[in-house]
Amino acid sequence: GYASGDSVAFFEGGEGIEPWKRMQRAAIRTPLKVEHLLASSALPFIFPAKKINREYFGDGSMRQLAPMSPAVHLGAERIFVVGVGRMNEHDVRRRGDIYPSLAQVAGHALASIFLDQLMIDIEQLQRVNDILGRVPPSVMEHLGLPLRQIETLVISPSERLDDIAARHVDALPIGVRTLLGGIGGTKRAGGGLASYLLFEKPYTRALIDLGYRDAMTRADDIVTFLGLKTVAAVP
């Protein structure tokens, strides 16, 4: 919320699930409506904030320090994460000899807001799982620690989304292109910023195609994780 500064998770669930409150994040039980969806997708400076009860809310990724926390609090035993970050690039470093443009800096800042926390949270969950796997359940029960292992499957793009965005900058309205061009946003290094502004069909179609290919590459993992018998390929 813009007034409180808290990351609020609105949820529906069984009566046994109690709302929670942590540092800078909280949960509120309420019937989910269209305004909650609009608020959760209200990108700053692009889509208008939505007022829910006493304050205005923006994109759900802002100040979301623990993105998987709501699923954990709601009792999830398995979490299927479809990310848009760079989980596959731990050992890949790009050379940068050219001073970063304003667009590149802005894209970097936006990534720190919308992408990085999810990857950090995934690593944290995996570390907790590893620790719990080394501690006998009887010890955890004796200590009274309400911790449990949570199975995760993480799928992330095999191609950088900012590279794809850089190839489709021409699909943006001319006014937006002109603005981006003045700060280096129409060059490859500015693709990160462009990816947050692109909602045109050529770009979204490319994302859908990439997502389909990556999902089919991991089809066996997905089938096993979801407990399915098989997955049908769509031409």
What are these model-predicted stretches?
Residues G1-P235:
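Patatin-like phospholipase
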